[in-house]
Amino acid sequence: WPAIWTLGSNMEWPSCGEIDIMEYYQIKGVPHILANAAWGTDKQWGAKWNSKATPYIHFTEKDPEWASKFHIWRMDWDEEVIKLYLDDELLNEIPLKDTVNGSIGKRTNPFTKPQYLLLNLAIGGINGGPIDESALPMKYEIDYVRVYQKEKKIVSGKVWRDTEGNVINAHGGGVLYHEGKYYWFGEHRPDSGFVTEKGINCYSSTDLLNWNYEGVVLPISEAKGSDIEKGCIMERPKVIYNKQTGKFVMWFHLELKGRGYGPARAAVAVSDSPTGPYCFIRSARVNSSIYPLNMTKKEKRIKWNLSEYEKWWTPEWYDAVEKGMFVKRDLEGGQMSRDMTLFVDDDGKAYHIYSSEDNLTLQIAELSDDYLSHTGKYIRIFPGGHNEAPAIFKKDGIYWMITSGCTGWEPNKARLLTATSILGEWKQLPNPCVGENADKTFGGQSTYVLPLQGTEKQFIFMADSWRPESLADSRYIWLPVRFDEKGIPFIEWVDRWKPN
């Protein structure tokens, strides 16, 4: 009879513990699939069993070809319970509070100790039943064995998996904290290519280490001509909660199907739940026919002849960009919006921060009270500075923003911006990253800065380490933000760390 099972090695059986992940044998001549665990009692070699036997016919009635197909047996084992599954059907649940050994096993719990894995095939015997020679030869085929261990610390740059063992696919994202749980939203990226194949993914966690997959919360549309039809590009999703309306509001950068990065739109969707589904509302450029608050009357009056500035990067071109040439160019249709983030201030006001003017200038725009549109109030910061990937946070009344330069998928030196008023004057400070590989942001690009709940002084810098040859294989970099004696934030590489 075939079995996939585990045994401990620190004591004799059964006090060492036994877990039968997959076992097949006959009970009173009837084939069964078993899911068991055994541990010790006060009697030597006397076992206490928690056993569930499911008749084989339970599976073959659903599918007569069941025996000829591969199936997945799975064990989820944590500090509280052992759960045994067959093709995602729970066969047995064994609470560890019940699995304490008797006196022979010194009242210890064998399932808090390591177990080793066995795969075997026994033939005949009491449990296997008589051997039917006519049925031989037979095959016991195993396609793979995989073991995943939940992380107890954040390890940047490695493959991160969710609680089901699947690779987390949430790139360019951000995290929302709501009612005791963190929700991580990000781009579902394909194995090859750059267009969106599924939509926006969501994962949830209570400890920032173990993430449950909540699904695609904003899928692409099957409707031909929809702004978010298959073939569009959905990037940098961020979600905020509106306390007044009770709605969860998602904004993201959208490029229309077949248009490359020309449309440069801001898109918005809304939901009654953090895990969706989100209803797509609209996409458009930002604040059409409205000038920025910090653009002078003189700059507004300038009439630009774009043909005179076709050659970029000249002193004359830089001067024109700083004075708002591209703002004027895009005035009627609205300002471009690419890499973006959202920020909710202490007074509940929300802001949309995005790369605009062909990625040359950052803009900060105030959102309406329901967070679903713009009020028309916005500013430009660092015209011609070539900033993208904004990630903003606030500490002790000071606003901080980490951005990157524009070098495509390749990493570059991060920038640190600061202000005392979000729609006020911003100034730039040196690279916040320190140490080895700091000039490349440790191989990543900023996407979000997450404030830890329960403290106003701890933040996590979130970045993506892009792999354009297979964007689905891009990695995550999460590092603690620290502050020097002057209160200026800095980021240093840490191999393994745990949020407090």
What are these regions (language model features)?
Residues 1-152, 357, 375-384:
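GH16 jelly-roll
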Residues 7, 17, 34-44, 151-234, ...:
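Beta-rich carbohydrate-recognition and catalytic domains
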Residues 56-60, 235, 326:
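Short structured motifs
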Residues 67-88, 94, 391-404, 415-418, ...:
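Short, conserved beta-strand/loop elements in beta-sheet-dominated catalytic cores
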Residues 98-151, 441-500:
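Feature marks hydrolase-like catalytic cores characterized by long aromatic- and Gly/Pro-rich stretches
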